[in-house]
Amino acid sequence: YPLFKEDLSLSFAQIGLITLVYQMSASVFQPLMGLFFDKRPIAWSLPIGMGFTLVGIMNLAFATNLYWLLASVFIVGIGSSVLHPEASRITFLASGGKRGLAQSLFQVGGNLGGSLGPLLVALLVAPYGRHHIALFMVFALIAIVVMIPICRWFRSYLNHIKKRPMLVAGKIERPLSSRMTVFAISILLILIFSKYIYMASLTSYYTFYLIHKFNVTVQESQLYLFIFLVATAIGTLLGGPIGDRVGRKYVIWASILGAAPFSLLMPHATLAWTIILSFCVGLMLSSAFPAILLYAQELLPTKLGLISGLFFGFAFGVAGIASAVLGNMADKFGIESVYNVCAYMPLLGLVTFFLPNLKKQKIQV
């Protein structure tokens, strides 16, 4: 973001708009893509999604104005709208019963990519110019190659299902009534709302906050962002397996509400403590999403794509809208006001108390 801001003379509000367009393009289409692939599975959908991402990266490297930049991030968002629901579905199906571990491994891959992104930008792009973003196309091409055996396995799975339709048509048990399912999903969406508003404040504006408050360089701020993103990767990796052992509800409860003390202290901390507290916040908050997604998938086991798309999409949408709103707040009231306000968002984790226990009852559908 600092490179785009400097090269194209963007305001904080325009930075927020870029994030909004990306997040909204992904969030609006993800549930639709998930529902579509629930009804019409396509074995090679993952490389199709990655192809959109590759084209978007190429355009990001050479965009010369805000509108071109917005179109580029929109294309990247379309790639995400295909990749996330489909990858989450395949992860669920291939988990072998260890759904939490499988979901965490899937999501930690994305988090690790996000963690390495700022570091690679600091090493490969910041010293040489924005056009070097095109180097990231290599990673997209590698990903497409890696997806080939996964797609072959998924094609075999789909062929197996077609030969044995009773696997699909047979009775599948749902843990809650329709009314309680809607209630539980509503609670989960409130938790996503809480988590991703605060995460948006860090992923979009943390570097600007550090530069403004502590006078660090752009490269130093990218390093500190990298530390935060590593924490999110670790938290994601831990959240799923712990949920398998102790229950999803308890992981959700501890991760979101447990981040509140750290978020409340961070606006008043020194640079060293800010880095430590941001690491703790990233670790706690990121452990929630694998548990939230699996809890929702287990509520509606016949709608894996729709649920994955809904929750990934809602998360992206909340983050996008939050980035735009927080950008305007930073322009009007200063960057520090963002963290003074967002510090209270993890307290919404209290609503986890109302989540039903999925082990209590099972209702056939």
Name the predicted role of every residue range:
Residues 44-59, 250-264, 343:
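Structural signature of the two symmetry-related core transmembrane helices
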Residues 72-109:
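Cytoplasmic helix-loop-helix junction between adjacent transmembrane helices
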Residues 29-41, 236-247, 330-331:
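Helix-to-loop junctions at the C-terminal end of transmembrane segments
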Residues 105-156:
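Helix-loop-helix hairpin linking two adjacent transmembrane segments in secondary transporters
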Residues 181-229, 233:
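Extracytoplasmic gate region of multi-pass secondary transporters
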Residues 28-66:
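Conserved MFS/SLC helix-loop-helix module at the cytosolic interface between two early adjacent transmembrane helices
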Residues 243-292:
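C-terminal transmembrane helical hairpin of 12-TM major facilitator-type secondary transporters
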Residues 23-31, 114-115, 229-237, 319-320:
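Residue-level signature of mid-helix packing/kink "hotspots" within the transmembrane helices
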